[in-house]
């Protein structure tokens, strides 16, 4: 198999400046593979880099290819690659450690400060026709798992990591704050891990309906309630305060509601990223021994996710609501910015636009 044609890529130059450009087709190193990209999802972080040119300390200083929720086909392997061959369909884990530091040695490579991560400045992403990546972080997809499911393993991994950090187990009562793509994958995984009841909050009625379809037991459409009122509604629906809360919005009022809602001795996991400084009722959490935990991306999740998808124990296909060919990427980004649908997928292979 050979790379042919142009390497069309979606490139952000600075805040508000998003372009479709042709990039050189890369040559894989000894431990890398060259991929013909198939499906790449648009993440909120991609839109944020486009709109603002930065996320926290990660600043777009040079043109950067976006995209990190991805799958594709191997078309060339480096000399040292033995477990993959041309023609293999793979899902891409976007974070690749650059060194074996203390975090890698303890299995928490996501915390390595020098990690390569697709579409995080200055590292290019994979929203393009052809892309090279570390072979060790490309995972072969079973025939029963589609390319789109392979791309969705990235957001699904956030749910796996968050629910593991939260300690979801058989019989857990769980509150998920926010029903965007990340809130929805947390619903899926919480139920998969044995949660007895899951309640979800959001502003959008349509997204809450999707949450119900994916397994949520109860939903609350937020209007103008105070954080304490939201917490009271959560308790009323569950019949008790939840032992576990997964906050997926990053909005100050939602974090406040999450603290008030969580049962004494319970766990709150902060997944959504908002302003660097927020005002929260920390004393309320402290005196009730509510453990507040963060997560940063994920680690050791791709094999688990592939096994779950191959076994058909979970269904993430309903997350994809819109599809665009790569040539219409700018239209796809505008659609995402307007908040339409749930997950928008870009199809990068002009010869195969199937899921």
Curated annotation (Swiss-Prot):
Family the entry assigns: Belongs to the zinc-containing alcohol dehydrogenase family.
Modified residues (N-acetylalanine): 2
Tissue-wise expression: Expressed in liver.
GO cellular component terms, A-Z: mitochondrial membrane; motile cilium; protein-containing complex
Main location (coarse class): mitochondrion
Needed co-factor(s): Zn(2+)
Pfam families, per the entry: ADH_N (PF08240), ADH_zinc_N (PF00107)
GO MF, one example: NAD binding
Gene3D superfamilies associated with the record: Medium-chain alcohol dehydrogenases, catalytic domain (3.90.180.10), NAD(P)-binding Rossmann-like Domain (3.40.50.720)
Residues holding Zn(2+): 43, 68-69
Topological category with respect to the lipid bilayer: Peripheral membrane protein
Protein name listed in UniProt: Sorbitol dehydrogenase
EC number: 1.1.1.-
Annotated positions binding NAD(+): 182, 202, 207, 271-273, 295-297
Function: Polyol dehydrogenase that catalyzes the reversible NAD(+)-dependent oxidation of various sugar alcohols. Is active with D-sorbitol (D-glucitol) as substrate, leading to the C2-oxidized product D-fructose. Is a key enzyme in the polyol pathway that interconverts glucose and fructose via sorbitol, which constitutes an important alternate route for glucose metabolism.
Cofactor note: Binds 1 zinc ion per subunit.
GO biological processes: fructose biosynthetic process; fructose metabolic process; sorbitol biosynthetic process; sorbitol catabolic process
InterPro entries tied to this protein: ADH-like_C, ADH-like_N, ADH_Zn_CS, GroES-like_sf, NAD(P)-bd_dom_sf, PKS_ER, SDH-like
Catalytic activity: keto-D-fructose + NADH + H(+) = D-sorbitol + NAD(+)
Subcellular location: Mitochondrion membrane; Cell projection, Cilium, Flagellum
Enzyme category, top tier: oxidoreductase
